[in-house]
Amino acid sequence: RNACANAAANKINNARFICADATDWMRAAAQPNSGLPHPDVVFLDPPREGSTPACIDAVAAMKPKRVVYVSCNPETLARDLMFLVRNGYKVKKIQPVDMFPHTNHVECVCALSRR
């Protein structure tokens, strides 16, 4: 609801917001003839454990032009990026973001595009 309200307040009418389990939605949307839209850009911000293999498989199957992956865990980030790179994506930029100063935690925002 907040995303929709923010879009309306800013007169953004070219975005669609979906509230669902990411793995379930991506798997359903990746099916041929699902009737669900294949997005141009996929944003992933999984928990510390990283994305599920099924969700990453679905992202690769949908072949969006770009993927933005936000991660708080370098190990799972490396694992998931390796899979995306093997499936036709190139890492364009990785930007660490210190959201928790004076701790050893850092978020990384990764921009990928299809080769």
Over which residues does each language-model region extend?
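Rossmann-like S-adenosyl-L-methionine
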Residues: 1-115
